[in-house]
Curated annotation (Swiss-Prot):
Gene3D superfamilies, per the entry: YVTN repeat-like/Quinoprotein amine dehydrogenase (2.130.10.10)
Single Gene Ontology BP annotation: antibiotic catabolic process
Protein's name in the database: Virginiamycin B lyase
Keywords assigned: Antibiotic resistance, Lyase, Magnesium, Metal-binding
Function field: Inactivates the type B streptogramin antibiotics by linearizing the lactone ring at the ester linkage, generating a free phenylglycine carboxylate and converting the threonyl moiety into 2-amino-butenoic acid.
Keyword Metal-binding: yes
Gene for this chain: vgb
Chain residues that bind substrate: 229
Length: 299
């Protein structure tokens, strides 16, 4: 495997709680400052821009590149979905029901954005124009968390407090699939090129592969206290994930081979993760830095 080079870019202050990160087709990195009440942009030339949000405490958390090539993000405390244009023009879409606490968000095959409502026990769908539909889940108190588009045309999500994943579409009712471990606490979810889903289980320090046939394979990490959080797939067949509790970025191949990369500063608290158009891996560190790793080819 080629040597992985890690480079950090200061983009915020530790007290601003840098959280989510997403890449757009122009090579820019967009990120959320959960306590800084702002969205930031790191351009390919290294310039940092900041876009304040019109809330005292909107708590922007997860961010993704939408089907329109623009950054879309959830505001957990403001109960809204936001979208930014490259020039900083902001649109906000308030959710129909209060205190839903939207969290995970991902683009779907239908050209819409799908999001998880942690406190609402619902999955939401928003069009590019801002029309919102919501779908009740059959599990109460499950804490729907992160979203991913599956190769099967469905949207998949984690249920953090139910130890399960679920699937849904605009025409298919939600289905729930327990992961088997009572302490799993799944958070991040991603789909690989073979159609399998990969889940970061923060509760028991493992990465799980959930294949198209429903078979579950668990890959324990070096420490059960690693607290894997976000996960993303690269084009080479690797899954990259943040280890919030272990101060590392992890990598797992489709065959289950694991590797880990220590962050330079102790207590960096990595959260969100994304892959840019050049195949580099980016992670958001709560210390106010983005770290870039040059993605290695498959072993």
């Amino acid at each position: 495997m080629n040597q992985v080079e890690m480079t950090e870019f200061p983009v915020g202050k530790p007290q601003e709680a840098l959280y989510g990160v997403a890449s757009t087709p122009d090579g820019a990195l967009w990120f959320t400052l959960a306590k800084g009440n702002a969205i930031g942009r790191l351009s390919p030339d290294g310039a940092v821009s900041r876009f304040p949000l019109p809330h005292t405490d909107g708590q922007p958390t997860t961010i993704t590149c939408g089907p329109d090539g623009r950054p879309w993000f959830t505001l957990s405390s403001a109960n809204a979905i936001g979208r930014l244009a490259p020039d900083g023009a902001l649109r906000m879409f308030e959710l129909p029901r209060p205190a839903s606490r939207p969290f995970g968000i991902a683009g779907g095959h239908d050209g819409c954005l799908w999001f998880a409502e942690m406190a609402g026990d619902r999955i939401g769908r928003i069009t590019i124009d801002g029309d919102i539909e919501e779908y009740d889940l059959p599990v109460k108190g499950g804490y729907p968390s992160c979203m991913a588009a599956g190769r099967d045309g469905l949207m998949w999500f984690t249920l953090n407090q139910a130890g399960a994943v679920g699937s849904i579409s605009a025409t298919a009712a939600p289905r729930i699939f327990p992961l088997g471990a009572a302490d799993a606490a799944p958070v991040g979810i991603a789909s690989d090129a073979q159609g399998a889903l990969w889940i970061a289980q923060a509760g028991n320090g493992a990465i799980v592969r959930f294949d198209a046939g429903g078979r579950i394979t668990e890959f324990p990490l070096h420490s059960r206290a690693a607290r894997p959080h976000a996960i993303a797939a690269d084009a080479a067949g690797n899954l990259w994930f943040t280890e919030w509790g272990a101060n590392r970025i992890g990598r797992i191949s489709e065959a289950g081979d694991l590797a880990g990369y220590e962050l330079a500063a102790p207590g960096s608290e990595p959260h969100g993760i994304a892959i840019d158009p050049h195949g580099c891996v980016w992670a958001a560190l709560e210390t106010g830095r983005l770290v870039r790793l040059q993605a290695s080819p498959r072993d």
